[in-house]
């Protein structure tokens, strides 16, 4: 995994970032990567994890639920976890 050939983490979709993160975890678990390379891909994995968390947070912030009045009629929307 050469950092020069890799796309910028922020340019990856959630699915692309998760897929690359899974490859990194697999390589580290196998233990057949040199120490310097392990550190390099671990750091990339940390960046991918943070990117995925940010994308998930943004998606959660966009999800809303319909608020109903006492008669059950739609009254507006509110954040999904507001109660």
UniProtKB/Swiss-Prot annotation:
Keywords: Cytoplasm, Exonuclease, Hydrolase, Nuclease. Gene3D superfamilies: Exonuclease VII, small subunit (1.10.287.1040). GO terms for biological process: DNA catabolic process. One of its GO terms (molecular function) is exodeoxyribonuclease VII activity. It is an enzyme of class 3 (hydrolase). It comes from the Bacteria. Its EC number is 3.1.11.6. It is found in: Cytoplasm. It catalyses: Exonucleolytic cleavage in either 5'- to 3'- or 3'- to 5'-direction to yield nucleoside 5'-phosphates. Signal peptide: none annotated. The keyword Nuclease applies. GO terms for cellular component: cytosol; exodeoxyribonuclease VII complex. SUPFAM superfamilies: XseB-like. Belongs to the XseB family. Bidirectionally degrades single-stranded DNA into large acid-insoluble oligonucleotides, which are then degraded further into small acid-soluble oligonucleotides. Heterooligomer composed of large and small subunits. This is Exodeoxyribonuclease 7 small subunit.
């Amino acid at each position: 995994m050469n950092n020069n050939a890799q796309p910028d983490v922020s340019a990856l979709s959630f699915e692309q970032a998760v897929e690359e993160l899974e490859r990194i975890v697999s390589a580290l678990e196998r233990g057949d990567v040199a120490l310097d390379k392990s550190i390099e891909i671990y750091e990339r994995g940390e960046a991918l994890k943070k990117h995925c968390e940010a994308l998930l947070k943004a998606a959660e912030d966009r999800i809303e639920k319909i608020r109903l009045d006492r008669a059950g009629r739609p009254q507006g929307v509110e954040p999904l976890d507001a109660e």
